Structures are given as C-alpha cells and as structure tokens.
Swiss-Prot record:
Similarity comment: Belongs to the troponin T family.
Species of origin: Bos taurus (Bovine)
Protein's UniProt keywords contain Phosphoprotein: yes
Annotated Basic and acidic residues bias: 31-53, 62-74, 113-155, 183-194
Residue numbers bearing the Phosphotyrosine modification: 221
Encoding gene (name): Tnnt3
GO molecular function, one term: tropomyosin binding
In-chain residues carrying the UniProt-annotated modification Phosphoserine: 2, 90, 161, 168-169, 205
Name listed for the protein in its UniProt record: Troponin T, fast skeletal muscle
Stretches that traverse the bilayer: none
GO BP annotations, alphabetical order: regulation of muscle contraction; skeletal muscle contraction
C-alpha cells in the first residue's frame, strides 16, 4: 500500500470521526398515548418535512490490502521528530550566529581600545618631548641670563675699581641716602600709627553705628578735601619754582654776556 493511499484512508477516517462528533443525538422515543381525538374542522397545517440526515459510511478500504495504523503512527512521529529537529537546528544556527557576532564585536572593541591606547601613548610621548624641549630652552635662557649678569657685575666692578677713592665716597653717599629714606619711612609709619586709632564698634547700637559711620564719612571727606587742596598748592609751588628757575637762567645768560656773574646759588653752591 503506497503512502498516498494510506494518507487518503487516514483523511477519510478523520472526516468520519468529525461527522460523528457533529451529528445530533437521536430523538428519544415518545410513548404512544391513546386519546380520543375529536374531529375539529380546522385548516390543515403543513407538516414540516424532516431534513435528510447524512448517512455515515465507513471509509472504504481497498480490497486486497490492509491498513497498518502502526505504520501511520510511526510516520507521524517521524514527521514530528523531523520538524522538531529542524527547529532545534535553526535555534542552534541562530545561537551560533549570535555568538559569532558577539565575538566579532568583542574583537572590534579590543581593536578600538588598542588603537586608543596607542594614540594616548603617542600623545603622551609628544607632550613629554615638548616639556623636555621647554625645560631645555628655559635652562638655556637662565644660563644666558646668569652669564650676562656675571659679565655686567664684572664690568661694574672694573668701573668701580677704576674710580679709586671716589668709590668709598659714593658708597657713603648711597648709605646716607638710604638712611634718610629709611628714617623718613619710619617717621611716616610712626605718624600714621599715632593717627590711626582702633575702631571699637562691637558695643554700639544701631543709631550709634549710624552716627559713627557719618562721623567717619565726614572725616574721610575732609581728608580728601585737604588732599586736593595740598595737591593744588603743590602744583602752584612747582609752577612758581619753574618760573623762578627760568628767570634765574635768563639772568645768568645776560650776566655772562655782560662779563660779570652775579652771586647766586649755582649747582648747589653759593658763589
């Protein structure tokens, strides 16, 4: 018996089972009740004809051949196994593909990481070279500056040694000027310390703080006014000194032309 005939027989068998399941159950037998029926002249009712029921027939089995249901069941199982095996194979193929993609992704990440590390190494090496170059240039400039300072000091020492005795007087005058400047600076600090009084306002109330602030403001305003007046006075004095010096210079020029030099302070000395 061929596979097609077996499948045909199997389909007919399945159709027969489905028809039996869908067929309604046979009506229950109603006992006959003998009652007297009175004849009534009524219109005749049309009796509904019962629908013909499908006749169930057993599947035709070809004569001379036997159906092997075990063989059919075995083929079904083999078919299911083949489908299951196909699903398993497709699952493993997809899994293998995902693993390959994951491996490729890891390789790309490692490659990118190595490239980034190489770039950082090159950048660090260039930065180190730049720092070394800057350090060398700085050391060279410092060496040149030290050499130039040494040469300048040597020239100064030679010039001062050539001055001879005037060097000691020069140092004495320089020390004297420094002493005067130091003394004036110390006097200024002393005067400022005397004038500057400590500001104790922790115990003052709000009104007294306002009064104190107004007092300080008035003092500051007065100081600024005095400063401005002193500045204007100093400007006038400088202007007067400049005019006097110009007059003295003109008088000296006229006296030189006349041949006689008047007595006056010239070059810091009286003549």
């Amino acid at each position: 018996m061929s596979d097609e005939e077996v499948e045909h027989v199997e389909e007919e068998y399945e159709e027969e089972e489905e028809a039996q399941e869908e067929a309604p159950p046979p009506p229950a037998e109603v006992p006959e009740v003998h009652e007297e029926v009175h004849e009534v002249h009524e219109p005749e009712e049309v009796q509904e004809e019962e629908k013909p029921r499908p006749r169930l027939t057993a599947p035709k089995i070809p004569e001379g051949e036997k159906v092997d249901f075990d063989d059919i069941q075995k083929k079904r199982q083999n078919k299911d196994l083949m489908e299951l095996q196909a699903l398993i194979d497709s699952h493993f193929e997809a899994r293998k593909k995902e693993e390959e993609e994951l491996v490729a992704l890891k390789e790309r990440i490692e490659k990118r990481r190595a490239e980034r590390a190489e770039q950082q190494r090159i950048r660090a090496e260039k930065e180190r070279e730049r720092q070394n170059r800057l350090a060398e240039e700085k050391a060279r400039r410092e060496e040149e500056d030290a050499k130039r300072r040494a040469e300048d000091d040597l020239k100064k020492k030679k010039a001062l040694s050539s001055m001879g005795a005037n060097y000691s007087s020069y140092l004495a005058k320089a020390d004297q000027k420094r002493g005067k400047k130091q003394t004036a600076r110390e006097m200024k600090k002393k005067v400022l310390a005397e004038r500057r009084k400590p500001l104790n306002i922790d115990h003052l109330s709000e009104d007294k703080l306002r009064d104190k602030a107004k007092e300080l403001w008035d003092t500051l305003y007065q100081l600024e006014t005095d400063k401005f007046e002193y500045g204007e006075k100093l400007k006038r004095q400088k202007y007067d000194i400049t005019n006097l010096r110009s007059r003295i210079d003109q008088a000296q020029k006229h006296s030189k032309k006349a041949g006689t030099a008047p007595k006056g302070k010239v070059g810091g000395r009286w003549k």
